[in-house]
């Protein structure tokens, strides 16, 4: 893997928000947000995901968690995770995001701070336009977030299904973060079959139904959609399609070319936690 030339990242205090860079710049904004939500929601409740359309901010994103512990677990577990063929670089954001600052009662209007800090004589027409539009002007060559987080409109965490499927992206846990041996559980992560308090009991034995090229998924969270499931299953050979059940968010079917390929995907993703409290249950569909 090629070495990425970058300055050492200074230690930053724990924050509700994690800053991610070295993301694939070819991925569209909506698809990137959807993919980030799919892999980070297992660590805790996500308040927002910020991805800028500004060219200088391409390849960067912010994921805002409700709890600091969720952000910490996500940072430790997903550091270096191969996301769209590029290892993610993750650190805590240097300042609280607007949504967290408002929760703490420490929010300060960003435009006022900029006006006090920067003399009018130094403002260029482009900078004035950026301030009037509510967007912070990007700093050339900067990789750290703009103080206070870049102002971007909040968007729903779950986007509409987009045509096509993203490239190979293994789910969390299949490729260990740097420094962990294969099969070793990263800090903050849970073994697939380990249950949280209040969770449903383990799934019935996998041999309940005879092998089938179609898998039956249960215990899916409300926000599950076709794209999210396709991201998890399309890495396995023989994947054909995901079929959702109208009016039921908690179940779905995934079809493969043959029973062997379906069984391999079932064994690999059995118990995968799509969210913190929803461990996916997979069985062969009834013939």
UniProtKB/Swiss-Prot annotation:
Gene3D superfamilies: 3.30.70.330
Keyword Cell inner membrane: no
Sites bearing Omega-N-methylarginine, chain numbering: 157
Domain RRM: 16-95, 213-287
PROSITE patterns: RRM
Keywords recorded for this protein, A-Z: Acetylation, Methylation, mRNA processing, mRNA splicing, Nucleus, Repeat, Ribonucleoprotein, RNA-binding, Spliceosome
Sequence segments annotated as region (Disordered): 106-134
Protein name: U1 small nuclear ribonucleoprotein A
Organism: Mus musculus (Mouse)
């Amino acid at each position: 893997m090629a070495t990425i030339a970058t300055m050492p990242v200074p230690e930053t205090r724990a924050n509700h928000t994690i800053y991610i860079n070295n993301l694939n710049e070819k991925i569209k904004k909506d698809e990137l947000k959807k993919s980030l939500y799919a892999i980070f929601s297992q660590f805790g409740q996500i308040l927002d995901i910020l991805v800028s359309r500004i060219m200088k901010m391409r390849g960067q994103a912010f994921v805002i968690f409700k709890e600091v512990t969720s952000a910490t677990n996500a940072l430790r577990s997903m550091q270096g995770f191969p996301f769209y063929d590029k290892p993610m670089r993750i650190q805590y954001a240097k300042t609280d995001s607007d949504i967290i600052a408002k929760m703490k009662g420490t929010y300060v209007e960003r435009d006022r701070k900029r006006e006090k800090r920067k003399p009018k004589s130094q403002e260029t027409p482009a900078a004035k336009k950026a301030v009037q539009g509510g967007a912070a002007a990007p700093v050339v060559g900067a990789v750290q977030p703009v103080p206070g987080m870049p102002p971007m409109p909040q968007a729903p965490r779950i986007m509409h299904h987009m045509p096509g499927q993203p490239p190979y992206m293994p789910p969390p846990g299949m490729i260990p973060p740097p420094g962990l041996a294969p099969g070793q559980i990263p800090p903050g992560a849970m073994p697939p079959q380990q249950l949280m308090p209040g969770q449903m009991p383990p799934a019935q034995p996998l041999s309940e139904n005879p092998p089938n090229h179609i898998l039956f998924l249960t215990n899916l969270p409300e926000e599950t959609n076709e794209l999210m499931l396709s991201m998890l299953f399309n890495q396995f050979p023989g994947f054909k399609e995901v079929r959702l059940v109208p009016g039921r968010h908690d179940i779905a079917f995934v079809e493969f070319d043959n029973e062997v390929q379906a069984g391999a995907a079932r064994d690999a993703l059995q118990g995968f936690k799509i969210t913190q409290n929803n461990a996916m249950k997979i069985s062969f569909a009834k013939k």
